[in-house]
Amino acid sequence: MPQSTIPSLFLLIFSLLTSLNTALADASTALVAMEDSQNPLIRISTSKGEMYLELYPLEAPNNVENFIALAEGEKEFTNLKTGEPIQSRYYNGMRFHRVVPGFIIQAGSPAINPLGLQVSLLNDEINANALGLDQIPALNPDGSFADVLNIESKPDFHEEILTPLYSQRNITDVEAALSRQYQVLETLQELSVKSVYENQGYRYDDSLESRPIERGTVALANSGPDSNGSEFFISLTAAEWLWGKYTVIGKVVEGQEVMDSIGNTAIDPGQFSSLSTLIYSVRKAN
């Protein structure tokens, strides 16, 4: 070997060892930061760096199992072009396609899966009582709505509270609404936040533990009750108006600086952006 190549070869080996040690240190730090080292630890490698997620299999067993199976390539799909069965690590090559700075970063939509892979939907796994939603009145004494409901306008009130309540009470026309308006008013005064969500179709499981959505929480995106699939989001802040409506599956325990870096640039989910963060891989780290 020429003498001149020895320093460059040494630098290459040193660089590889350093990067390996850094990765090991990150995983080691993540394990220390975990609430329970027996829980699954997931590494998300992205173009902005790595994040480590601790998952909560006892709190959302079916949805955590599904997330891991998608990440590890354990699910069998059908190739839409050939009709042949295919197994693929679902999240590899996807992007954080929706970013709202100061709020959430979101990825995993079947609509933008590189292979067009579609997933089955699972039920929610949420305990509203554990979140205290059964103890929060929907109406405040001054007639305003509980902050957690995030009711900001009359259309919000009709869509989120009144229409579901009318449906639940089988009130189908204006005449019925007028004749039962005092009954409806009494019901409104007795509603808890949990009851509001139940009228919207959410169902809860008191046997599970549930956590609030806080900074770093990993939860499943949905289009309404019992519509959990592959899409997930990481919250950049506490978001009490999401409690009871989204199944929490874990938390970022290492790499929050990467999470924040991804969250610095707004990304519109309706159009592709080269500024969106690429996901290299999602896989178990323990």
Predicted segments with their positions:
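Cyclophilin-like peptidyl-prolyl cis-trans isomerases
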Residues: 20-286
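Bacterial N-terminal signal peptides
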Residues: 8-19
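Positively charged n-region of N-terminal signal peptides that target proteins for export
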Residues: 1-7
